[in-house]
Amino acid sequence: MTKGTPSQGKHNKGSNHIVCRRCGRRSFHVRKKVCAACGFGKSSKIKRFAWQWKKVTGKGNRVK
């Protein structure tokens, strides 16, 4: 077997993320046991931030 750059291409097998049980997205990190999308495994609350939605404008109509 050779070493060097040609061998590095053989390291792309397997996957770091699998389908999350809570949100259903392919964001659950296998080794960390944490979902990158919803925070499952780290927090009991769904991960969310204020910058995910546009700011409230006018009479309080939230625009997505």
Curated annotation (Swiss-Prot):
Zinc finger (C4-type): 20-38
KW Ligase (keyword) present: no
Cofactor(s) of this protein: Zn(2+)
Residue numbers binding Zn(2+): C20, C23, C35, C38
An example Gene Ontology biological process: translation
Pfam families: Ribosomal_L37e
GO function term, MF aspect, one: zinc ion binding
CC per GO annotation: ribonucleoprotein complex; ribosome
Entry keyword Metal-binding: yes
Cofactor detail note: Binds 1 zinc ion per subunit.
Residue spans crossing the bilayer: none
UniProt entry keywords in alphabetical sequence: Metal-binding, Ribonucleoprotein, Ribosomal protein, RNA-binding, rRNA-binding, Zinc, Zinc-finger
Sequence similarity: Belongs to the eukaryotic ribosomal protein eL37 family.
Task of the protein: Binds to the 23S rRNA.
NCBIfam families: PRK04179.1 (NF003214)
Protein name, UniProt field: Large ribosomal subunit protein eL37
Gene of this entry: rpl37e
